[in-house]
Amino acid sequence: MTKRVSKSRRAFTKSMLALPAAASSAASAQPVGANGGPKVLRYAFRVAETGFDPAQVQDFYSANIIANIFDPPLTYDFVARPTKVVPNTAAALPEISPDFTEFTIRLRPGIYFQEHAAFKGKRRELVAQDYVYSVKRHYNPKFKSPRIYLLETSKVLGMPEIRAVAMKGAKFDYDREVEGVRALDRYTFRIKLAEPAPRFQFYLADSWLGAVAREVDEMYDDKEMLANPVGTGPYRLVDWRRSSRMVFEKNPGYRDDVYQEQATPGDARGQEIAARMKGRRLPIVDRVEVYIIEENQPRWLAFLNGEHDLVEEIPYDLANLIVPNGKLAPNLVKRGIRIDRDYRASVDMALFNMEHPIVGGHTPDKVALRRAVGLAYSIDNEIRLVRKGQSIPSESPVSPQTSGYDPAFKSEMSDHDPAQAKALLDSFGYLDRDGDGWRELPDGGRLVLQMATQPDQLSRQLDEIWRKSMSAVNLNIQFQPAKWPENLKNSRAGKLMMWRVGWVAAQPDGDTFLALGYGPNKGQANHARFDLPAFNKVYARQRTLPDGPEREALFLEAKKLFVAYMPYKFVGHRIEAAVFHPWVVGYRRQSFLRSLWKYVDIDNDVKGERNA
C-alpha cells in the first residue's frame, strides 16, 4: 500500500508541474470575453456548510456565505491594513456614549430586501426595526444561537429577562419593548448595555447581526430558515445541493453601491487594487458557485484545470510544491497565477471536555493528565510534517492580528517534552499495571483517550501525529470519525471527550480567543466547558476596559490560567495563502471581512485568452 501511495503522489506531482493552461470542460462550456458571457466566480470549500441563518450557524464556512446575503450595519474596508470598520447599511459609524454603553446607529434609506413571497409582491425596505428583531432572534431559545454568548456577555439591557421567560416554555415575546435594543425612528436604532463594551461595534460589522425580515422568519420554521436566506446583501441563493454545491446570483434589487475602499499609505498591493477598482458599481460578478471538495488533490486540480478561479486555503500537503521556500512556484508564476499570504487570525487546538469523567475536572490528577497530554504532543511534527511550515506554534489562544497578542510571550503550551509528560503521569498514578503497554487510571480503571475526528486527508494525517505522540508516553488514544457538522453539534452538546478544531476570529480583538474559556459560554464558544471562577473574573473585567496596559495585564493573567489548567492544547496560528488565476481581479485575503464576492471581478477576456 505504501508503494502505491508513493507512486500516486509522484504521478500527481509530475502532472501538476506539467499541466498546461487548458480549459476544463466546465470552463470551456461557459461563454467568455466579447461574446457577452456572464462573469462567474467558482471555488471550493474543504468543509461542508451547515446552513444560512445568521442566528443558527457559527462555522467559518457558513459564515462566509451568510456575509454575502445578509447585511450587518457596519463592515470592514476590504483593502485597508490594518483593518478598519466602515459603514455598511448605516449612514455613518455609530454614535457611542463616552462610557461605551450606548450605540446609536442611523441607517441609509432606500435599501431593500431581495424579492420573496413573504413580502406579497411589495418591495420591502430595510428599517431600524429589522435590526432590533434580528438581535432579539439570537435570544430566542428555539434557534440555539451559537452567538448568544456575545450578546449575553455584553449585557444588553432587558433581553436576558425575555429569554428567561421563553426558556421556561413561553412563546418568545418579540414585541415587548426593552431598553437594551429599540428603534428610535424608522431608520435609527439604539443598543444600550449594562456595562461598558468599548469594542461592541466590531459585532455590528459581523454577519451574525445581518438583518432578517420578520415576515420571512414567520413564514418558515427554524430548520427551514437554514435553507431559505433572504437578505439585503449583494447575492441571493438560487441552488443548493447540500454538502456538494451552492449557487448564488446577483440580487437584482441590490442598492446603489460603488467601490470606495481606501488602501493604507505604503501598502502597494492595496493601492493597486483600490486604484483599479475605484468607482465601479458593486457587485461585479454575476454568479458565484461554491463547491464542497474535502480532499486536497481534487480541489487543487480543479484550480489548475481552470474549473475554479481561486483557492483560498492552499492544501498543506501540497505547500512545498505550491510555495517552495515561501515563494510561489515558478511554473505557477509563468501561468500568471498570483498569491496573497498572511496570518489568519485563528488558533488550532485540541479541546478536553472538562465535564468528562476521564479528562475533565480541576483536581491535581486531572490537570496532570491534560498537561501530560499537552507535553507529549509534538507541535513541531504537526507544523513541519502536516502543515508544511504554514503555521507558528501557539503559546496561548490569542492570535496575531488581534489585540492581546504578544509575540514575546512564551509558555509551556508549545513545549514538547515526553520525559516530563511521563514523569507527571507516573507521579499521579497513571501507570501500566497489567503490562499491556498502556497506562491505566490511578484507580486501575481503563484509560483510553477518545478523540473525535473527520474522515478527510488532513484529519487522518493529524490523527497519526497524535497517535505517535501519545504512544511515546504509553497513552492509548482512539479516533472516532464523523462529518465536521456532526462533530460540531456533539461538541456544543458536551458529548465529546476530545476534539481538534480551529477557532477563527471575526474581529481584530483577542477577546474572541479568551471567550473559549469563559464559563457562561459553555456549549457556545467554550467547547471545553471550562468553568473556573478566577478565569471568569479576569475575562469579565477585561471586556469592560479600553485597550491599554490594564487590559493587557488581564490578557496575560488569562493566558497563564489557560496554560496552568490546560482545558485546551493550543497548537498553532495558521499562515494561510490564497492563489488565484490572472483573470481574478481585485482579490485580497481579508481576516475579518467575509463578504468578499462583491469586491472581485472575473475578466472573461483574460480567461478566454489563457484558456484558448
Language model region names:
Residues 571:
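Active-site-proximal polar cores
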Residues 41-44, 450-452:
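Short, well-ordered beta-strand segments
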Residues 13-21:
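Sec-dependent signal peptide hydrophobic core
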Residues 55-64, 120-126, 204-208:
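Short Gly/aromatic-enriched secondary-structure transition segments
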Residues 2, 6-11, 30-35, 78-79, ...:
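Extracytoplasmic/periplasmic ligand-capture domains
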Residues 44-98, 230:
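N-terminal lobe/hinge region of extracytoplasmic solute-binding protein
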